[in-house]
Amino acid sequence: MKKRILASTLLLIGLVISGCKAPVKEQEKISYDRPLPPGELALRKITNPAEIPDFTMACLDLAELRAAINNSLNYLRKPSSQQFYPLGEITHAQATQSLEAFAKLLDSGLAGAQLNQAIREKFDVYISIGCDDHGTVLFTGYYTPIFDGSFTRTERFQYPLYQQPDDLVKDSRGEIRGRRMSDGQIIPYPPRAVIEGAGMLQGKELAWLSDPFEVYIAHVQGSAKLKLPDGQLATVGYAANNGHEYKSVAQELVKDGRIPPDQISLAAMIDYFKKNRDQVSTYIRRNARFVFFKKEEGQPLGCLNEPVTAYRSIATDKSIFPRASLAFITTTLPRAVGGQPIKQLYSGFALDQDAGGAIRAPGRCDVYMGQGDLAGQLAGHTYQEGRLYYLFLK
């Protein structure tokens, strides 16, 4: 859903939670978005056994993991996936065989300490160098919102989601090249303010929502479920973007003093724009990135064009991390307890199945939290440092 997607920098800033380390104070000027230094790899093989994480607790909670692995294997078995490998020292065959071997371990019925031991014997473990070359990764969350919507414009539904325009050009890897002009020249695609202000996409409307900020949330998250007037649910997913960098509206609201930094959240933004609808356009146009959509069947899809799974799918920078591969994360994540987000220490296996407009560095990782309002709350409470590992067959 993301490269789709999103950036959960919409979401909470400065959580302080015992256990896993919370993000450092702003004055320390840590940059989670620090680019990968030239010539370096994002993953470093762990050679000291003492530095390999304990997988035991994660081996007791394997729900939905097997299905998520199958989704990654479906992708890796497509010939088109081979163009993205090798990545560093990781080959396409190694990524595929590693998932197949891990799936066999799951199918064997091993769990807990026994599965932990088998993993340590059969797999090498790599760690992301993070934002500081010491493994520090900022974990944020994203989700699939569910909005009332329509595929036809009505008095209630006035705010469109647009299809990919015919003049948008991608390369063979799906990267945005720009806009093809009538003479064949390719130029940068216009930013959001020009697209919206000039009505460039008239006739390319895909669906309509009732609230302009809900449209923007769909842009940030990269997909949405629409509850249609007849009660049916439809999915609209990411098709492309205009090639511009993402800029956080949340940070703009804080900078302008509209919402205090210790109160910024998706819920606070929704509340602010409901009370100040005349400001929605002003703020969202500060983010030059514009997302185009397409109809999808079934569950929301990640950038691999495979379904994403709550807590089992992560979004990373696909230019530096091996897509579809098996990952392991240790951090603090919120879980739903009694219908409310409760933050807990977390370690779990995940699959690298998505990408995000704001997730462009070895120090960033976005965790998919599911669908609907509660998932949105969980995503909004996800802003925490941790460690990101990858597992490959020895």
Regions found by a protein language model. Give the residues of each.
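Secretory/export targeting leaders with adjacent low-complexity proregions
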Residues: A42-E306
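Bacterial signal peptide processing site
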Residues: K21-V24
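Bacterial N-terminal signal peptides that target proteins for export
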Residues: M1-A7
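N-terminal basic/disordered segments at the start of proteins
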Residues: E28-I30
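C-terminal soluble interaction/assembly domains
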Residues: E296-K394
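C-terminal motif of bacterial Sec signal peptides marking the signal peptidase cleavage site
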Residues: V16-G19
